[in-house]
A protein has these predicted regions:
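N-terminal transmembrane-helix/juxtamembrane module of multi-pass inner/ER membrane proteins
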Residues: 1-48, 81-109
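Membrane-helix interface segments
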Residues: 28-31, 60-65, 135-141
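Transmembrane-embedded, aromatic-rich helix segments that form part
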Residues: 47-50, 165
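Interfacial segments of alpha-helical transmembrane regions
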Residues: 54-78
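Membrane-water interface at transmembrane helix exits
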Residues: 55, 79-87, 132
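Short helix-capping/hinge motifs at transmembrane helix termini and TM-loop junctions
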Residues: 58-59, 87, 158-161
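Membrane-embedded catalytic cores of phosphoryl/pyrophosphoryl-handling enzymes
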Residues: 102-174
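Positively charged, low-complexity/disordered segments
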Residues: 176-178
């Protein structure tokens, strides 16, 4: 059973990366600069930390800022521990794989830590969910697109497997005071 699960996961990761490579080949001149900008914004969670700190300045957004900062702190610790515990190599690590050639085509964005879970996606999920739970419910569901877009960029550049991104979303832990 365990081998079946691993084979299914690897097949899913490969199929989704293959699809991303097709997107790159067909729409890369349009998509790549936009997605590169988005993924750079997510480096070290910097944009999410800055926005959370800005939210602290205003009474109306202070709750969202506090929730987001706490979630981001928990996320950094959890992601760091999980990356070491799982020790999954990046998709491009095996130079004889499709992933490696796709990574080169996508611009060979360099990443040095382990792959699972996606730290960018975890931070984006923490930030998006923090805003979701602390804002007007009528429109707050739009904040949930933040992790989807960030996760998409990480798979597009072949720096993460699809399952790394899913892990980043699922790993999210919220202090969620309501």
């Amino acid at each position: 059973m365990n081998n079946f699960i691993i084979a299914t996961q690897l097949s899913l990761d490969h199929d989704i990366a293959s699809f991303m490579n097709k997107l790159l080949n067909n729409f890369g001149s349009f998509l790549t600069p936009i997605l590169k900008f988005i993924t750079i914004l997510g480096n070290f969670g910097t944009i999410f930390i800055i926005l959370s700190l800005l939210f602290l300045l205003f009474t109306k957004t202070r709750k969202a800022g506090i929730i987001a900062l706490i979630a981001l702190l928990i996320g950094v610790i959890t992601v760091s521990i999980t990356k070491i515990a799982v020790s999954r190599d990046r998709p491009f690590f095996d130079t004889n794989s499709d992933f490696y050639s796709w990574w080169l085509q996508a611009g060979a964005v360099k990443e040095s830590s382990y792959s699972f879970p996606s730290g960018h996606t975890t931070a984006a999920t923490e930030f998006g969910v923090a805003l979701f739970i602390s804002k007007n419910k009528k429109y707050s569901w739009l904040f949930l697109f933040i992790p989807l877009i960030m996760g998409f960029t990480r798979i597009y550049f072949i720096v993460h497997y699809f399952t790394d991104v899913c892990g980043g979303c699922l790993l999210y832990t919220s202090p969620s005071p309501r």
